[in-house]
Amino acid sequence: MTTRLTRWLTALDNFEAKMALLPAVRRYGRLTRATGLVLEATGLQLPLGATCIIERQDGPETKEVESEVVGFNGQRLFLMPLEEVEGILPGARVYARNGHGDGLQSGKQLPLGPALLGRVLDGGGKPLDGLPAPDTLETGALITPPFNPLQRTPIEHVLDTGVRAINALLTVGRGQRMGLFAGSGVGKSVLLGMMARYTRADVIVVGLIGERGREVKDFIENILGPDGRARSVVIAAPADVSPLLRMQGAAYATRIAEDFRDRGQHVLLIMDSLTRYAMAQREIALAIGEPPATKGYPPSVFAKLPALVERAGNGIHGGGSITAFYTVLTEGDDQQDPIADSARAILDGHIVLSRRLAEAGHYPAIDIEASISRAMTALITEQHYARVRLFKQLLSSFQRNRDLVSVGAYAKGSDPMLDKAITLWPQLEAFLQQGIFERADWEDSLQALDLIFPTV
């Protein structure tokens, strides 16, 4: 009896060992519909944001396409692929990434940490620079909980951007969030490159979202340069990738900046562009049936913008900071575009680039009259503020009467402010212009302003 029991227990142990070698059970659903950008699947219960794998045929081989749950209707899941969908068949099997399909899947974990410095990655953390995957064991979720506003450090310190017009006339504070409003071809990328090279920050995170592939390479190699790239992390999600990957790229760039901020470092975050991020969300929202609102943008777009922007800024007292510059494309130089209007309301200031100035060869083409830094008054002295006000008054007076002065119709002495503007105009114009490879730090910028207004 004992021998038989021993034999039976041994057989049971062998059976258990063989069972352990079998592959884990994978729940899967089936693809039932493909319309435009969205695929529909049934048979799985997964939360929004969960990652799925769809089987596709590539000749005799079966390959996998990564997708994400962007919505559901009853038992139907709406999926948006992150890759090319060619070869996907009706009824193709759909797996949850964790293999269970029970809704218990955790959020995405993407690489973080100092090992990312000098690297160029896509929105999913995969290398685009031809190098191996980042050598880091540190990972983190893509989305973090909202920051308690009462725990943020106030904006108290000036950020030296290396650009004279910004330093002196549109002073930016460490932890401020600024918008760079510009149409196409007015020097936006060049100005961003100058700030990336010359800004006094520990780390630079660049998010190139929805841009042309040629512009991505040009920005990294020529505008950012080797010096800027050494202390930078570049996340690139060009225009030809999935809208989901473009949105994820913006969130990932922000998450990397948050990670460095939490390490006590001061980060410069450059996002080019916030408009392409909004357009990517519009593509997704319209594809899953959300009704359009203002100029074709669904309401979810205007909810996503502040959720992204509010993640930047100062950390807790004694911690690091994220100073962010978001570019906003103004189509046809329309400052009332809905995205531009929404961004202006949620940012801490805006720098407007003028096509008129760019066409006149005036670089950087910053329209000082239309630009503002909301944190500036808390950062500068009364004397500095008085000089800035006088500078803007003289600039505005000259611009309003430029035609009269040009044709000789203005009689000197009619307007004391205009008389002073005409006298100082060469100095004002020279102050606002700066070479691409010329650095003007904070002290030099103030000294240049002092030379124009020594008695103010």
Swiss-Prot record:
GO BP, sorted A to Z = bacterial-type flagellum assembly; bacterial-type flagellum-dependent cell motility; protein secretion by the type III secretion system; proton motive force-driven ATP synthesis; proton transmembrane transport
This chain's source organism reads Salmonella typhimurium (strain LT2 / SGSC1412 / ATCC 700720)
State what changing residue 188 to I does: Loss of flagellum
Which CDD domains is this protein grouped with? ATP-synt_flagellum-secretory_path_III_C, ATP-synt_flagellum-secretory_path_III_N, ATPase_flagellum-secretory_path_III
- Which Gene3D superfamilies does the record cross-reference, listed alphabetically? 3.40.50.12240
The residues that hold ATP are 182-189
Q: Name one GO molecular function term.
A: identical protein binding
Protein name (database record) = Flagellum-specific ATP synthase
Q: Which family does it belong to?
A: Belongs to the ATPase alpha/beta chains family.
EC code(s) of this entry: 7.1.2.2
Q: Which cysteines are joined by disulfide bonds?
A: none
- Keyword Membrane in record: no
As recorded in Swiss-Prot or TrEMBL, the protein's gene is named fliI
Q: What does this protein do?
A: Probable catalytic subunit of a protein translocase for flagellum-specific export, or a proton translocase involved in local circuits at the flagellum. May be involved in a specialized protein export pathway that proceeds without signal peptide cleavage.
One Pfam family, short name please?
ATP-synt_ab
Quote the NCBIfam families the UniProt record gives. FliI_clade1 (TIGR03496), fliI_yscN (TIGR01026)
**What chemistry does it catalyse, as a reaction equation?**
ATP + H2O + 4 H(+)(in) = ADP + phosphate + 5 H(+)(out)
Q: Does the keyword Aminoacyl-tRNA synthetase apply?
A: no
One GO CC annotation, please? type III protein secretion system complex
Q: Which SMART domains match?
A: AAA
Annotated keywords: ATP synthesis, ATP-binding, Bacterial flagellum biogenesis, Bacterial flagellum protein export, Cytoplasm, Hydrogen ion transport, Ion transport, Nucleotide-binding, Protein transport, Translocase, Transport
Q: Where in the cell is it found?
A: Cytoplasm
Coiled-coil annotated residue ranges, if any: none
